[in-house]
Design a protein with these regions (language model features):
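Conserved beta3-strand ATP-binding lysine motif
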Residues: 15
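Extracytoplasmic
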Residues: 1-8, 18-84
Length: 84
């Protein structure tokens, strides 16, 4: 489980997975596509959250989200969470 992330509290979430192995597979795929992707842990429902990238500002995250929604995953969304 890779918990190292970019500094930032604004995370563009790609997918949530119940099975850890599935989240790791998606992580590898996103990294191959050039994203600075990470698994940021499990949410309160026990789902592993895979993020495309994390950003220090809301504006940066929103800009990336628009591009990702158009090109990768129309269901991507922004999670605001301090992981430190």
């Amino acid at each position: 489980l890779n918990l190292k992330i970019n500094k930032g509290n604004f995370h563009v979430v790609a997918w949530d997975f119940r099975v850890k192995k599935n989240s790791e597979r998606k992580l590898r795929e996103l990294k191959r596509l050039g994203f600075n992707a990470n698994i940021i842990g499990q949410n309160r429902y026990g789902l592993y959250q895979v993020v495309f990238e994390s950003f220090p500002t809301r504006e940066q995250a929103i800009r990336k989200l628009y591009k990702i929604k158009k090109e990768q995953n129309p269901e991507a969304w922004i999670l605001v969470k301090d992981l430190n």
